[in-house]
From Swiss-Prot:
Species: Saccharopolyspora erythraea (strain ATCC 11635 / DSM 40517 / JCM 4748 / NBRC 13426 / NCIMB 8594 / NRRL 2338)
Name this protein carries in UniProt: Small ribosomal subunit protein uS15
GO cellular component: cytosolic small ribosomal subunit
Similarity annotation: Belongs to the universal ribosomal protein uS15 family.
InterPro entries reported in the protein's UniProt record: Ribosomal_uS15, Ribosomal_uS15_bac-type, uS15_NS1_RNA-bd_sf
Molecular functions per Gene Ontology: rRNA binding; structural constituent of ribosome
Length: 89
């Protein structure tokens, strides 16, 4: 699922470190999470769409690597992010 420009701006405003932040780990994880949620909903209806499933697995892996990086750099930023995104239950 592609995100519209307005959706991206809203997510970046909420999770970015400053106004024009698009590259911080928090911003990237938030954008990936939104795309993962959309693709998960798509796959619930289209169970045999294996091409999209592979894309989903790649996105989940990329998000996992970014979260691992964030734990090494700043554990408090990591904890804040997963709590705001609701990733761990």
């Amino acid at each position: 699922m592609a995100l519209s420009t307005a959706e991206k701006k809203q997510i970046l405003a909420e999770y970015g470190l400053h106004d024009s932040d698009t590259g911080s780990a928090e911003a990237q994880v938030a954008l990936l999470t939104k795309r993962i949620i959309g693709l998960t909903e798509h796959l619930k209806q289209h169970k045999h769409d294996h091409h999209s499933r592979r894309g989903l697995l790649l996105m989940v892996g990329r998000r996992r690597r970014l979260l691992n990086y964030l734990t090494k750099v700043d554990i408090e930023r990591y904890r804040s992010l997963i709590q705001r995104l609701g990733l761990r239950r």
